[in-house]
Amino acid sequence: MPEQELLIGQEMNTLHAGSSTDGINVGNAGRTRDTQTGVEGETEIGSDEEDSIEDEGSSSGGNSTTERLVPHQLREQAARHIGKIGRHFNILDRLFKKRTQQSSDIQQGAMFDGVFSNLSAKPDTTETEGNNEQDIPPTYDEAAADMAPSYYGMDLNNSDIYYDEICIEGLPVGNIANLLWNIIVSTSFQFIGFLITYILHTSHAAKQGSRFGLGLTFIGYGYSMIPNDVTSKVGKNKSLNRMELEDPNEFDDVRLNSQSTTQDKFESHLNHGLDEEKQNIPWLAVFVAFLGLFITLKSIYDYIQVKKLEKKYLNQSQNQA
């Protein structure tokens, strides 16, 4: 029995020793594995750090080269211009933005009442609709039946340059002095005087005076076209007295009271055509003279009509007063 117990004790010791050796071996193996993984991790970390350092170096080198070639401000300006050009040519974004803005504006203003939302008393829309119906313009027949007033075309605004004068068709009537002065200027300078007085007229009297002067100019031109008869100085249907010389070679010594001479009474019956041409008056002269006469009469008639209108308006204003 004691021998068996000794054998069992030895076997147990051997088992414990084997297990301890196995544990030591396992621990050693784990330690070796940990050391191997640590070394591998360190090698990997080192390689990553080297790669990052290389990348940083390459990027820093690239940035330094780009900064040397292109300045930073120029790159920013170029980026801004490119962005502006892109926004300018981006048509789709513009269309969508406009649509969204329109829809948002409609939605925002649809539920509000404008400036009257903060007021307790708001205007009634029914009254405005009734007033609009009452302010309907008249029909064509009603407007045609309404005659123009008697003072139509008359301007009584005293703030204008024509103070206290009645304006007809935008011009004051004027007086006789303006009429005579423009007649004198238009007649004296003929066409140039007519242009100056007609363009610069400020009244009906000045206008009609310039036209009257033009008519007198035409009458003068028509009269100047009529030919003059030389024999009219002696008298109509009379011929000049001619004397007959005894010696034709002594014509230089002829005196009035030197000798008695005989009158030459020879008359030719041939038609030389001189008197017939002088007696005929050209039709152009007649036309120009009649044109001038018509212009003068028309100017006087127009001025008289304007004066009658002025008198009529003055009488109406006095009756109303």
Curated annotation (Swiss-Prot):
What InterPro entries is this protein classified in?
A: NEDD4/Bsd2
What residues does the Glycyl lysine isopeptide (Lys-Gly) (interchain with G-Cter in ubiquitin) crosslink join? K312
Gene Ontology biological process terms from the UniProt entry = metal ion transport; positive regulation of protein ubiquitination; protein targeting to vacuole; ubiquitin-dependent protein catabolic process
Residues in compartment: Extracellular: 1-178, 233-280
Keywords of the record, alphabetical order, are: Endoplasmic reticulum, Isopeptide bond, Membrane, Stress response, Transmembrane, Transmembrane helix, Transport, Ubl conjugation, Vacuole
Any one Gene Ontology cellular component term annotated for this protein: perinuclear region of cytoplasm
Membrane-spanning parts: 179-199, 212-232, 281-301
Presence of keyword Cytoplasm? no
Query: Which ranges does the record list as Cytoplasmic topological domains?
Result: 200-211, 302-321
Biased composition (Polar residues) is annotated at 11-23
Chain intervals for the UniProt region annotation (Disordered): 1-71
**Effect of inactivating the gene:** Increased accumulation of copper, cadmium and cobalt ions and enhanced sensitivity to the toxic effects of copper and cadmium. Exhibits no additional sensitivity to manganese. SMF1 fails to enter the vacuole and is stabilized. Reverses the aerobic defects of yeast strains lacking superoxide dismutase (SOD). Concomitant deletion of SMF1 completely abolishes the ability of BSD2 deletion to suppress SOD deficiency and reverses the increased sensitivity to cadmium and copper. However cobalt ion hyperaccumulation is not suppressed.
* Biased composition, class Acidic residues, residue ranges: 41-57
Topology relative to the lipid bilayer, per the entry, is: Multi-pass membrane protein
Q: Where in the cell is it found?
A: Endoplasmic reticulum; Vacuole; Membrane
Additional note from the record: Present with 3070 molecules/cell in log phase SD medium.
This chain's function reads: Required for homeostasis of heavy metal ions such as cadmium, cobalt and copper. Controls metal ion transport and prevents metal hyperaccumulation by negatively regulating the SMF1 and SMF2 metal transport systems. Under manganese-replete conditions facilitates trafficking of SMF1 and SMF2 metal transporters to the vacuole where they are degraded.
- How is this protein named in the record? Metal homeostatis protein BSD2
Please give the organism: Saccharomyces cerevisiae (strain ATCC 204508 / S288c)
Gene that codes for this?
BSD2
